[in-house]
Design a protein with these regions (language model features):
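Terminal, low-structured helical/coil segments at or just beyond the last alpha-helical repeat
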Residues: 21-32, 188, 192, 196-245
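Helix-start (N-cap) detector for alpha-helical repeat units in TPR-like alpha-solenoids
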Residues: 33, 39-41, 74-75, 108-109, ...
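Alpha-helical segment of the N-proximal tetratricopeptide repeat
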Residues: 36-72, 82-86
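Structural signature of tandem alpha-helical TPR/SEL1-like repeats
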Residues: 52-62, 86-99, 120-133, 155-167, ...
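Structural marker of alpha-solenoid helical repeat scaffolds
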Residues: 69, 103, 137-138, 171, ...
């Protein structure tokens, strides 16, 4: 019995040794493969492949190979920023995005990366600054204007939020979320007429797309606004501030 156990233990150790050797060869193969590639864009693709499998450290090593040859290759810095952000290493991600923008001030993807990081840290003014920079070259991008409007809303600059939501629906009249948000913006501005107009648009678009949630929100907003329209400032204050009637 002891002899059988010793034999089994020997084979187990042998299998573990062979597995370790196999893994080591794989790692060496990966390193040699990246060292044989000279095209920086191909190396970045290889790094992205590593990133998708969660091998962040290997991906960063590959990108560092690119930067050893050309430290001013902005796409490599940008990709490092993406990897570090996904890895939840914000400090390193911030440094990488900033480096990409420093090298190429019109690198919009890197600026959007910075804005994403600032949003996660609730640094809305800094995020807004990056979105506005991107908007200089992407004037007709509804997605960018939507993000700008959101930042202004968070900063409680309501007129500016309205301005950019309006720009969104000018570019894309069927942008349902922008119309929904405009209801809240006009409600905040006590511009009941405009709010009612947006409710009509939202109900039309939501019926067209069978979006029951948007329809429900619009109907609830309609009830709320109708209840507020004919109230005096004194009435509104009495109903919205304690002690409540």
């Amino acid at each position: 019995m002891i002899k059988v156990f010793q034999i089994n233990f020997f084979f187990l150790c042998l299998l573990l040794f062979l597995f370790a050797c196999s893994e080591h060869k794989k790692e060496e193969g990966g390193i040699s493969a990246s060292s044989q590639i000279k095209d920086p864009d191909e190396l970045i693709k290889l790094a992205v492949g590593k990133q998708t499998t969660g091998a962040y450290d290997e991906a960063i090593d590959i990108l560092n190979q690119v930067l050893e040859v050309n430290s001013l290759y902005a796409p490599a810095h940008y990709q490092k920023g993406l990897i570090y952000e996904e890895w939840d290493r914000r400090k390193e991600s911030l440094a990488s995005y900033n480096k990409a923008v420093e090298i190429n001030p019109t690198y919009n993807e890197a600026r959007l990366g910075l804005a994403s990081l600032y949003d996660k840290s609730v640094l809305n003014e800094l995020a807004l600054e990056q979105y506005l920079k991107v908007a200089e070259t992407r004037r007709d991008d509804p997605g960018i204007h939507f993000k700008i409007a959101l930042e202004y809303w968070y900063l409680q600059d309501i007129p500016k939020a309205a301005e950019h939501y309006i720009r969104v629906v000018e570019i894309n009249p069927e942008h349902l979320q922008a119309h929904l948000n405009l209801i809240s913006v006009y409600e905040s501005m006590k511009n009941w007429g405009k709010a009612l107009e947006e409710i009509v648009v939202v109900k039309r678009l939501s019926q067209k797309t069978n979006n029951q949630q948007a329809t429900s929100i619009a109907e609830n907003k309609l009830k709320f606004i109708k209840g507020r329209m004919n109230l005096t400032k004194k009435d509104i204050k009495r109903k919205s501030e304690p002690p409540f009637d």
